[in-house]
Amino acid sequence: MHRSLLLKLSALGIIVVLFFGIQTVRWSGEKGAKKAHKHFIQYLSDRRWSKCSRMISELYDDQWKFNRNDISLALRDFGRHFYISLSVDWKTMSATKMKGSHAIKGAMRIEGSGSPAADYIIKEARPYLIDSFTFIWSRSGIMPWSWKLEKIKHPSIKVPPGYVPGDQSSSLKW
């Protein structure tokens, strides 16, 4: 009786070790950063804001002086107008290993529908989408899939004066 229990526990332990070994390989280095980025873009398209927020690092900081909470609210402000559909397409141009992180650079295309402001937002965003975005990702824990977004860079996007992330009255300013 004890021997069969020991064999079952040993088999379970081997399965768990194999699972984590495989996941470590699948989510390591550049592959892991690209995989995390792909999930993030898919969550944006699906308007799953809480999933996006969980992928943003507590230490998030960017050129617009946004922190984790600010960028989460700004994404919601943007997406609030696309309640019928939102499609975010990403084409990776390069992936670069940096000290302790990975930079995923690429082009983004946005389509969608919803409120009357949605068409206006897409029209206003098009000139900015010509330039590439850079997303900086780093591993944040012991789990192989624990990648977090640390920074978003873009050469020409500016935050309009008076824009406050999460303030619905100012969400159309951007």
Indicate residue ranges for each PLM-predicted region.
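Solvent-exposed, well-ordered amphipathic alpha-helical segments
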Residues: 2, 90, 135-139
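Short, low-complexity N-terminal intrinsically disordered segments enriched in polar/charged residues
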Residues: 2-49, 54-58, 70, 77
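Charge-dense, low-complexity intrinsically disordered segments
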Residues: 27, 62-65, 124
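Residues that act as N-cap/strand-start positions at coil-to-secondary-structure junctions
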Residues: 36, 87-89, 129-131
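Short solvent-exposed beta->alpha transition segments
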Residues: 50-114
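Exposed beta-sheet edge and beta->alpha loop/turn motif
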Residues: 97-174
